[in-house]
Regions:
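N-terminal glycine/serine-rich phosphate-binding loop of ATP-dependent small-molecule kinases
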Residues: 1-97, 124, 152, 226-227, ...
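Short beta-strand-loop/turn "lid" adjacent to the catalytic site in phosphate-handling enzymes
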Residues: 64-100, 129-133, 164-185, 210-215, ...
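Short, basic and Ser/Thr-rich N-terminal targeting/leader segments
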Residues: 11-13, 72-74, 79-81, 135, ...
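Active-site core segments that coordinate phosphate-bearing ligands/cofactors
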Residues: 5-7, 107, 114-126, 131, ...
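A conserved helix-loop-beta module that forms one wall/lid of the active-site cleft
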Residues: 200-213
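Structural signal for short hydrophobic segments within the conserved structured cores
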Residues: 28-32, 209, 460
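Carbohydrate-associated surface elements
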Residues: 103
């Protein structure tokens, strides 16, 4: 009987499930759409009961379509978005809707913390910045605006922690994810009550479940879950992975010469390093990586291809091929039309919002699409340039995410950055990485390093056109000037209001 490992991947828009054999060969993938709720402007929520129903359904569909039985699955892992807030009450029931990482309701709280110097106080301990989608920001918002709900909190979790609890009935917070929550002291490798005290949320210390490892077996499929999903009761479930970590694993990032860019709802640039550094040029975000003594370092903002998805939804049906053809039909780096990809947040200040600038009657849909492609790449460059100060010997960027399927977009990224672009040929990095964690946890590999060496994926390469690079650098500078001008505008508005 062939053995398989199940990897679940819970993202912003889809819940996916993939099956892989001992050698990493895919036996099937199923996906179901996820619904994000926005009861008020700037809010992003998810019905927790509905998410669990979706999880059970996607597992059942995977088993049905693949012909694999629950008896053949010997380990399960979960990869998921980071941050956000999934709460259970003191009776172990979902406490309202989950709040997603793209939620912005806590903006005033974050702004107040910034004015009070809290981020500078936290950073040496947590190695995190402070923003609206962090669990701590959302917890403080609940304390101030929904005190009755806050008082009922029995357990604080994030996405894959909640799904793991649904599968096993065992609570825990997985380390690669909780280490980027501002609840975790990066040097100590554990929760730190000083942090919740400084943030004014010390009441939830009792509700923080144990920290668990990515490949640690945290529980087993319950009898009830087995009936509902078709899985076998007693199947081990490992801690899982923050999706950014899963992607870095699948991209084969293992030294300081290569970075990983994830292009999805979020623009994320990641690198792997040993040890923490003090006195760096920027407050880089660190997180615990899967190998002992290693950390993932990244820069991120919700400024990537989610902007294109929104735009195409407004225009009606247009295929990815049609978009690429439209963008490719125009001169590279031509014109002065700009798009600011800040529909879901920005990397240029809390007040910055999205929009086109420089639009005239001569512009067509193709020009707008090209501006979106360029704006997303320019926003990625903000993070990439900062990361290249930290990883000064980088010569290669490995890219994953939907835009990696567009040679037009990837060539643009190569031309703007001047870097060698490598495209790992792995389709579902979340599912594959989660199943990889399960294989490590069930003893197929001694550790993630051995697994990564054994499962290297083929890579496609694109090289930059350095003539076009010079043209794009000029346009990128104009983009930066536009950002600076708008920052000045918002500063003057703020002064006037105050």
């Amino acid at each position: 009987m062939t053995q398989y490992w199940l990897g679940l991947d819970c993202g912003g828009s889809w819940l996916k499930a993939g099956l892989y054999d001992r050698e990493g060969r895919e036996a099937g993938v199923q996906r179901l759409p996820l619904c994000a709720l926005s009861p008020q402007p700037g809010w992003a929520e998810r019905d927790m009961a509905e998410l669990w129903q979706c999880c059970m359904a996607v597992i059942r569909e995977l088993l049905t379509h693949s012909g694999v039985s629950g008896e053949q699955i010997v380990g399960i892992g979960i990869s998921a978005q980071g941050k956000g807030l999934f709460l259970l009450d003191k009776n172990n029931k979902p406490l309202g809707n989950a709040i997603l990482s793209s939620d912005r309701r806590a903006m005033e709280i974050v702004r107040r913390w910034q004015e009070d110097g809290i981020p500078e106080k936290l950073y040496p301990l947590t190695r995190q910045t402070l923003w609206t989608g962090h669990p701590v920001s959302l917890l403080r918002w609940l304390k101030e605006h929904e005190p009755e709900r806050y008082a009922q909190i029995g357990c604080v979790m994030m996405t894959h922690d909640y799904l793991r609890w649904c599968l096993t009935g065992v609570k825990g917070c997985e380390e690669s994810n909780i280490s980027e929550s501002n609840l975790y002291n990066m040097s100590l490798g554990e929760y730190d009550p000083c942090l919740t005290d400084w943030l004014g949320i010390a009441e939830i210390n009792h509700a923080l479940p144990p920290v668990v490892g990515s490949a640690e077996i945290c529980g087993e499929i319950t009898a009830q879950t087995a009936v509902l999903t078709g899985l076998k009761a007693g199947t081990p479930v490992v801690g899982g992975l923050f999706d950014v970590v899963s992607t870095a694993l699948c991209a084969g990032i293992e030294d300081e010469f290569t970075l990983n860019a994830v292009m999805g709802t979020w623009a994320v640039t990641s690198g792997i390093t040993r040890g923490l550094r003090d006195g760096e040029a920027h407050p880089y975000v660190y997180g615990r990586y899967v190998n002992d003594g290693e950390f993932i370092v990244h820069e991120a903002s919700p400024t990537s291809s989610g902007n294109l998805e929104w735009f195409t939804a407004q225009w009606g049906e247009i295929s990815f091929d049609e978009i690429n053809q439209a963008v490719a039909s125009l001169p590279k780096a031509g014109g002065d039309l700009f798009f600011l990809p800040f529909l879901y947040g920005s990397n240029a200040g809390l007040e910055m919002t999205s929009g086109f600038y420089g639009m005239q009657a001569i512009h067509t849909r193709a020009h707008l699409l090209q501006a979106i492609y360029e704006g997303v790449v320019f926003s990625h460059m903000t993070h990439l340039n900062r990361m290249r100060e930290r990883f000064s010997d980088v010569h290669t960027l490995r890219v994953t995410g939907g835009p990696a399927h567009s040679d037009v977009w990837m060539q643009m990224l190569a031309d703007v950055s001047g870097l060698r672009i490598e495209l790992p040929q792995v389709e579902e990095t979340g599912c594959f990485g989660a199943a990889l964690a399960a294989r490590v946890g069930t003893g197929v590999y001694r550790d993630f390093s051995e697994a990564q060496r054994d499962l290297q994926h083929p890579v496609r390469t694109l090289l930059p056109d350095m003539t076009v690079h010079q043209l794009y650098q000029q346009k990128y500078q104009r983009y930066q000037h536009l950002i600076a001008a708008l920052q000045g505008f918002h500063a003057r508005i703020k002064e006037h209001i105050l």
